[in-house]
Amino acid sequence: TTPAPAPAPVRHAFTRRSLRPVNPLKELHDLAGLFPEPADAPLFLNARHVAREATPEPYRTMLVHEHHMTISMESWHHCSVDVEVLESRFQDGLYLRKIRLLKSGTSRVVQFGYVRFNLELVTEPVRREILEERVPLGRILIQHNVFRHVELGAILQFTAGPGLAHYLQMPAEADTWGRLATIFCNGSPAIDLLEITAPLE
């Protein structure tokens, strides 16, 4: 068999201040560390960086693109999604939050993740709606016609620990997939994301 291709280097950081090379696993731990889990219930047992072209279906379709995950989730699940903000706070002038996306009107979780956002890069109406924590971030940016683009950073495979099993309603020690991405607003890196999908059938 042909060996799986090695992951390509990540071209820039998912960083609030500058573009620089990073280790995706370090960035993963930095984002997950914004809201640490208890030591006896870690978020994941293992995580590895996987080349985009080695990502299996259906996760490749779900994750390997430069679009908002809100749109991908709604397309895949054939319904709108709601956001549930589990925790949020400000740190060093940045807005941080831990979230889940749910199939609209249900308790079915489809995505878990972390957001690190420099709100200075969007207008006051956009900031206000984001801080209300009622509408998914991607939908707000689209509805306000914010000039933006999504840059995919890295694809990650996870073995769920008790934390991820709880948040995604999945078995512990089972695998799922996620990604690191950056959203640029008005030409500047504004939003760092860790987005992990619930297991797909």
Across the structure, where does each feature detected by a protein language model lie?
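Generic alpha-helix initiation/capping and coil-helix boundary signal
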Residues: 1-2, 106
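Compositionally biased, low-complexity flexible segments
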Residues: 2-9
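N-terminal domain-onset segments
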Residues: 11-96, 100-177, 184-201
